[in-house]
């Protein structure tokens, strides 16, 4: 059986937010009995369509709904755009409405 994990989900066009996510992962890794799981989301086009997800060569892999369902805790990271999170992260979260409606994320800090 695998350890419970904190899902560290981020979007970073530059390395700033990604570096913060890596530091968070190091902190989670210091706690016995839980592990970090770094995930990112694919970019979206200027017309808010999902672009074809590219599998990153290195760094965090793309997040799936199963990552959200299985996590014991969730940390989100994104640069802000006009007071909101970056569009790719918002788009991904908008696609998880079925998880919210199905109560799959209840009780996850």
PLM regions: where:
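Short, intrinsically disordered, charge-balanced linker/junction segments flanking boundaries
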Residues: 107-109
